[in-house]
Amino acid sequence: MYIQSLALTSYRNYEHTELQFDNKVNVMIGENAQGKTNLMEAIYVLSMAKSHRTSNDKELIRWDQDYAKIEGRVIKKNGPLPMQLVISKKGKKGKVNHIEQQKLSHYVGALNTIMFAPEDLSLVKGSPQIRRRFLDMEIGQVSAVYLHDLSLYQKILSQRNHYLKQLQTRKQTDQAMLEVLTEQLIDAAAKVVKRRLTFTKQLEKWAQPLHFGISRELETLTLQYHTAIEVSEASDLSKIKNSYEESFQKLRDREIDRGVTLWGPHRDDLLFFVNGRDVQTYGSQGQQRTTALSLKLAEIDLIHEEIGEYPILLLDDVLSELDDYRQSHLLHTIQGRVQTFVTTTSVEGIDHATLKEAEIFRVASGKVID
């Protein structure tokens, strides 16, 4: 798939902009704070219905306007697919093929994108929350069912935490309701964890040979989904539920004392090992960057395996963060397969072969010249 055109209305520092893209490589050149990253973000928001930079949608709306609109014409193997996302202070509404989607979870997945920005290098060394978000965003692109299960889990978790807080402060004394909420939470949690376990194994399958190649055949990358219960990728839903039920029995009194849920996928993590050693703790900066790059490149093949089409790759000021060898490996891996968008302050450092086939856009003060 690829984006043929993009139109922005009142988005960030863009008043109104319409662009036509090359189906291979598009390079956005400009000084910092001119709007390059805003363009990349707009493509990502069109795809995911949320920003990778902020959780406050109001920041996406031009300061003097009431709403922002992103429109794109996506070309897929079955033909063109118009998409539209309107962001207002009341919320977001998405259309796919001119049909308004009742839920954003139905909207997400029509356009698949992979964002690789400097902050993604913290995927390995950052907090578990970053890695959980990575799992949720990437699985959500290929599974609307997962987004539904995750949303349900988060809703029940909030209700359960509220009830635990009431038990803690003696505003409630009936633990029967806690049992009901726990049963519901276990059911939702098991589905979320099962899908994450499967995804982790799929991601490892694609990331392992990539990492081996980038490391000049010196390093073997393995992934582990870390959860407090005894489960594996081979565990079925009933085994996962049984493990959670045992955890609840052990932790119930502590949870009431603390007024919060102490188990579940909202506390899990994704771990990375190179030659058996934890990369986050013991890996060099080079190993951490190779791991992050391998994961991002692996997503391309994983999504292709799941949906039969390659996603769009967004490289936002990340090439300058990679040494020549890793940059060359990245560009060689994607060449000719994936529509790619690159932002940079200068074309220096981007290899000649990539520039030769690229469409060049110059960005300044919210204006784009091609």
Curated annotation (Swiss-Prot):
This protein's GO CC annotations: cytoplasm
GO molecular function: ATP binding; single-stranded DNA binding
Binding positions for ATP per the UniProt entry: G30, E31, N32, A33, Q34, G35, K36, T37
Keyword DNA repair (UniProt): yes
Any Pfam family: SMC_N
Primary localization: cytoplasm
Compartment list: Cytoplasm
GO process terms (BP): DNA replication; DNA synthesis involved in DNA repair; double-strand break repair; SOS response
Superkingdom field: Bacteria
Keywords, comma-separated and alphabetical: ATP-binding, Cytoplasm, DNA damage, DNA repair, DNA replication, DNA-binding, Nucleotide-binding, SOS response
Gene3D superfamilies per UniProt: P-loop containing nucleotide triphosphate hydrolases (3.40.50.300), RecF/RecN/SMC, N-terminal domain (1.20.1050.90)
CDD domains: ABC_RecF
Stated family: Belongs to the RecF family.
The protein's role, per its UniProt record: The RecF protein is involved in DNA metabolism; it is required for DNA replication and normal SOS inducibility. RecF binds preferentially to single-stranded, linear DNA. It also seems to bind ATP.
Name this polypeptide is given: DNA replication and repair protein RecF
Lineage: Bacteria, Bacillati, Bacillota, Bacilli, Bacillales
